[in-house]
Amino acid sequence: MPVKSKAQPVSKASLKRLREEEEELEDSPSSSDFEQGSSQDGLSDGSDAEEDFEDVDSDDADAPRIAQWEPDDDDIYNKIEEEEEPKKQPSQLSALENNLRGLPLGALRKAQKALAQVQAESDSESESGDEESDEDSGSEVEEESTKPQKVEWISRDTKKHARANKHAPMEVTSKKPVSRKRTVVEVPKLVPRDPRFLPTAGEFKPEAFQKSYGFLAESRKEELKTLKETLAKARKAMSSCPAHLRDEREQEIERLERAVKRTESLVNKDRMDAIQQQALQRVKKEEKEKQKQGKGKWFLKQCEYQRAFLSGYELTCSPSGKTKGGTKGSLRSFVAGRWSPRSQESY
């Protein structure tokens, strides 16, 4: 740091000495030679300069003092820090490597992908800036070979777009890849079909159906008989059932009762269908014999259908006219519900 000298009174002797020194300087050689000589002398003989300063101080205490520049302490500290920084770098790298080794592979993979994406974006921005500058200057642009990015076709949206409402539907792309397969020969598409409803199967005939699937009625009768026997055994075992199993046995009895009712309804339906078919066949046979004698076409009415059905039902029931379902009045209402336009066919 430069040393500031205090202002002191100047004597006549000192003024005279200063004038003599100025005259000597004017008579001395050029400034460049003086500087070169002084620099060389300063470098070679540092001790002589110190002695001269001491002589000046000793000759006249009132003469102006000359201050020597010295470097600041801050500059010294900065140089020391710059020398120490390259020494610290290897230790920091080793610490980072140790930290990265402790991380899981999944986290490292995610970080690698993020860095690659950021680097690609920065490269694209730099390339676009270079192209614009080259177009302005008219210089040639070097083309870099880049691989085409693979397009992934997925049903979900990879980019997170802000939605107006959290309950709003997600936007899904409508773009689909074109098939690489080329259709050379068009093959007819296979359509599932049911042979029962094809036109080649012909019209539905109840008589033929009854003859082909008549075994189903017999199997339902046997099933009903077995269910009734099982229900009777379950009710009998209920009396000697322990308390902790009573709920399960009651549920089992209820299930068997429902199965018996369902099977009974199927058996009764099969029996009614058989009676109806027999009554219609009998009426049809009688009308065909009358047509042979010269009678014209005849259409079955609802009242005649009920009469034929009741007559056939009476043949299969008891002579008293009572059935398990009720009397003849309730049976007539049942027959009226079974009337269908199919019964109006001509005979």
Curated annotation (Swiss-Prot):
Record's compositionally biased regions (Low complexity): 36-46
Region annotation Disordered: where it falls in the sequence: 1-187, 318-347
Record field: compositional bias (Acidic residues): 47-61, 122-143
UniProt key word rRNA processing: yes
Biased composition (Basic and acidic residues): 76-88, 144-157
UniProt-annotated location(s): Nucleus, Nucleolus
Coiled-coil intervals: 216-273
Keywords: Coiled coil, Nucleus, Ribonucleoprotein, Ribosome biogenesis, rRNA processing
Disulfide partners: none
Gene Ontology biological-process entries: maturation of SSU-rRNA from tricistronic rRNA transcript (SSU-rRNA, 5.8S rRNA, LSU-rRNA)
The keyword Thylakoid appears for this protein: no
Pfam families found in the cross-reference section: RRP36
GO CC, any one term: 90S preribosome
Subunit comment: Associates with 90S and pre-40S pre-ribosomal particles.
Function: Component of the 90S pre-ribosome involved in the maturation of rRNAs. Required for early cleavages of the pre-RNAs in the 40S ribosomal subunit maturation pathway.
Family statement: Belongs to the RRP36 family.
Name this protein carries in UniProt: rRNA biogenesis protein RRP36
Species annotation: Coprinopsis cinerea (strain Okayama-7 / 130 / ATCC MYA-4618 / FGSC 9003)
GN (gene name): RRP36
